[in-house]
From Swiss-Prot:
Cofactor note: Binds 1 Fe(2+) ion per subunit.
Limits of the JmjC domain: 250-420
Protein name: Lysine-specific demethylase JMJ13
Effect of residue 236 to A: Impaired demethylase activity
Gene designation per UniProt: JMJ13
Residues in FYR C-terminal domain copies: 677-756
Protein family: Belongs to the JARID1 histone demethylase family.
Length: 787
């Protein structure tokens, strides 16, 4: 149907021609068993469009043409095993669309609508069982979205992404990918184009029944003639009006405000993340779609429909997420497309947000699926770990953002474990969020908790339980590290959140670093097995207020409900631990006991210019800080005795004696050195309607001033320098010691030359390291543990 084809970019046109040539070559080459592949929109502008693309959609394989009518599915041999795949989509029988139950619909009053997170906590026990729910707003926007985008936002334009409308095969034979971008539009130009496409297809400018368009969509996906559609996803911005007279824009349901509300955990992030803490726009047309996916870190999402045609949603309850992934793994993907075995294999591919297949496949395997038809003025909320997908019935404009509450932490812990298993860099500092929320709860008064609802109390217990598990594990890991005798130094951790160089888990409370500062490692790894190129010096970085946190954890353990959860819940914060941790009271270990690290150390303080980062795209978004100042040159090589005592007692303090007059504190955010990993991570997104969200390349980091905390050296160090000065004066005042003085001066010159050469070597080594600190004095601790 040439009259419905969209004017595509040259890149997209070349891509489609490439697909046609490949399809023709495959048809000619398959002389015995011809494989018919149907291309699908399973990606948004990130992957190649091939008839059998490994990056697009559902697995659908049928045999030669003379047996197509007899075969409803197919099997494929992988390693001698036969695996049943997704059956051929029967377009003559789409009655399954009528069997899908509706998700719950809520119509709050204006009073109930006052606070979105309070209302969501109220409906959570029921709505979360469906994975998604719909909320009809009692408030109406007086300023239309079109007016906001055309008038309030000057020069608002966006570039679409080209989506193919076909089903595809999922195997390793077709991994050619390329980015297919569409045209750049104004809001009105895109609306005209989308409405023109709809009118040409149905000879109507009005809306059609939702059930009819749902069947039309799956027919088009299976065997339609429309090759592509254009979808504007991940568009920075918001269509909520800033006019004070707009009721909806002035309310807390304005998505610009949701993630920063008092009950949202994401308010604790120091830097905004587009699509997560800041909303994004999704401007669609007939049959533009968002593939099956789950939110980053299993976050909540809230989506508002500003204007236009309806949108159909399919949702899976979070409790059925593993069952969903199992069906996808066994019935959609081939084994050779999976990056890993087990349940995480399908999860890894689904993270690309490039897979679309009919819900009938899930119904046939007893996976619960619920449907929602969203209209303008309605919100759709997806709950933690709820997979969802959907498509548009015509031109429309939606907006979405993420948020999290206390009940999210158990889901976030699972997501962090799975990311570590797949060696994926996290988007959020999960450990830091736990600690901050827990310490806020610890400081709150009992009177503040008197009027809490059961759901709110449950959320608080989730936070406290997660916090206790984390603190208990880190205490045990530190005790094991102390017993090993392999820790050569202890430093106050003031760097915020860093990422483990081995498993990519985020570290906020404690981590181990090497001599060159470029290999931070979390405490889940065995120090004995570390093979670092810079040697075997391992310094433990520990947060200053660890004692306060341990005291808070001990307090939480005594509360009703929390102690029960601690004994029954799985401790997810140990994963992927490679160290053998003793059980309680084994080898003398007691939870929350005092841990002593005794060192005899040589402390050197040096300064280095800030190095140029090779690729800062994966610096931790939650605490991105830039330091451009360079510390003054300054050296010191006095020997000091240093004893760091880490305990849970209130009078114990993390202390260190450093032979320097001052030190500066800042944050450290290591850069991921694996370029391929960074490329893979670029596809991550948080919104329910994005394909290939290059969030990290479009992050708008807020410039924040980092206060450099200068600590004065203690009086003991001044006395040492005075004593040393007087000692030298006494030695060199005698005239009979002139020759000896000259010899010592020569030795000092030689020593200075050696020291200068060593510093030069260190500087050259550090210039080759992308993952670094820059612009502040560094503490190098060398020495042996005292027997």
């Amino acid at each position: 149907m040439a009259e419905r084809r969209i004017c595509l970019s040259k890149e997209a046109k070349d891509g489609l021609e490439f697909l046609k040539r490949k399809k023709l070559q495959k048809m000619r080459s398959d002389s015995v068993n011809e494989t018919v592949g149907f291309s699908t929109m399973a990606r948004s502008g990130g992957d190649a469009l091939r008839p059998t693309s490994a990056s697009c959609g559902m697995r659908l394989r049928v045999t030669s043409s003379d047996t197509v009518s007899k075969v409803h599915g197919a099997s494929t041999v992988r390693g001698g095993l036969m695996k049943e795949k997704v059956e051929k989509l029967e377009t003559d029988d789409l009655k399954w669309t009528e069997r899908l139950p509706e998700c719950p619909v809520y119509r709050p009053t204006k009073e109930e609508f006052e606070d979105p997170l309070t209302y969501l906590q109220k409906i959570f026990p029921e709505a979360s069982k469906y994975g998604i729910c719909k909320i009809v707003s009692p408030l109406t926007a007086t300023v239309p979205a079109g007016a906001v985008l055309m008038k309030e936002k000057s020069n608002f334009k966006f570039t679409t992404r080209v989506q193919p409308l076909r089903l595809a095969e999922w195997d390793s034979d077709d991994k050619v990918t390329f980015f297919m971008s569409g045209r750049t539009y104004t809001f009105r130009d895109y609306e005209k184009m989308a409405n023109k496409v709809f009118a040409r297809r149905y000879c109507s400018g009005g809306s059609l029944p939702d059930s009819f368009l749902e069947k039309e969509f799956w027919k088009e996906i299976a065997c339609g003639k429309t090759e592509t559609v254009e979808y504007a996803c991940d568009v920075d911005g918001s269509a909520f009006s800033s006019a004070p007279g707009d009721p909806l824009g002035s309310s807390k349901w304005n998505l610009n405000k949701v993630s920063r509300l008092p009950k949202s955990t994401l308010r604790l992030l120091e830097t905004s993340i587009p699509g997560v803490t800041e909303p994004m726009l999704y401007i669609g047309m007939l049959f533009s779609m968002f593939a099956w996916h789950v939110e980053d870190h299993y976050l909540y999402s809230i989506n508002y429909q500003h204007c236009g045609a309806s949108k159909t949603w399919y949702g899976i309850p979070g409790s059925a997420a593993l069952k969903f992934e199992k069906v996808v793994k066994e019935c959609v993907y081939n084994d050779d497309i999976l990056s890993t075995n087990g349940e995480d294999g399908a999860f890894d591919v689904l993270l690309g947000k490039t897979t679309i297949f009919p819900p009938k496949t899930l119904l046939d395997h007893n996976v619960p699926v619920y449907k929602a038809v969203q209209k303008p003025g309605e919100f759709v909320v997806t709950f933690p770990r709820a997979y969802h997908a959907g498509f548009s019935h015509g031109f429309n404009c939606g907006e979405a953002v993420n948020f999290a509450m206390g009940d999210w932490f158990p889901f976030g812990a699972i997501a962090s474990c799975r990311y570590a298993h797949l060696n994926r860099v996290p988007l959020l500092p999960h450990e830091e969020l736990i600690c901050k929320e827990a310490m806020l709860l610890n400081s709150s008064s009992k009177s503040e908790n008197l009027d809490l609802t059961p759901t709110e109390l449950s959320g608080q217990r989730s936070i406290k339980t997660a916090f206790v598990h984390l603190i208990r594990f880190l205490h045990l890991a530190r005790w094991s590290l102390m017993k090993s005798g392999l820790c050569t130094g202890l430093v106050s951790n003031t760097y915020g959140t860093i990422v483990c160089s081995l498993c990519k888990r985020d570290c906020y409370l404690a981590f181990i670093n090497c001599e060159c500062y470029s290999h931070p490692v979390c405490l889940r790894h065995d120090v004995k097995k570390l093979d670092l190129p810079c040697g075997t010096t391992h310094t433990l970085y520990l947060r200053d207020n660890i004692e306060d946190m341990e005291a808070a954890a001990m307090k939480f353990e005594k509360e009703d409900g929390v102690s029960d959860l601690i004994t029954t819940d799985e401790d997810l914060y140990k994963y992927p631990s490679s160290i053998t941790l003793p059980a309680a009271k084994e080898d003398g270990y007691t939870p929350y006991s005092t841990i002593y690290f005794d060192f005899y150390t040589e402390v050197e303080m040096t300064s280095h210019d800030q190095l140029q980062s090779g690729n800062p795209v994966m610096s931790y978004e939650a605490n991105a800080s830039c330091i451009s100042s360079v510390a003054d040159d300054y050296e010191c090589s006095d020997y000091v005795n240093r004893r760091a005592n880490c305990s849970s007692s209130s009078d114990s303090k993390l202390s260190e004696e450093v032979a320097c007059s001052s030190s500066k504190k800042t944050r450290f955010f290591p850069v991921v050195q694996d370029e391929q990993l960074v490329a893979d991570q670029e596809s991550d997104g948080s919104d329910s309607e994005c394909f290939r969200v290059k969030r990290r390349s479009s992050l708008k980091f807020e410039n924040r001033t980092v206060v450099l905390d200068t600590r004065e050296s203690d009086h003991h160090q001044e006395l040492k320098r005075l004593k040393k000065s007087h000692h030298h004066e006494g030695r060199y005042s005698s005239s009979s010691s002139v020759s000896r003085q000259e010899e010592e001066e020569d030795e000092l010159v030689i020593s200075n030359r050696k020291e200068t050469q060593q510093q030069s070597d260190v500087k050259m080594q550090k210039k080759r390291i992308e993952n670094h600190f820059g612009g502040f004095k560094r503490l190098k601790v060398k020495g042996l543990i005292k027997p």
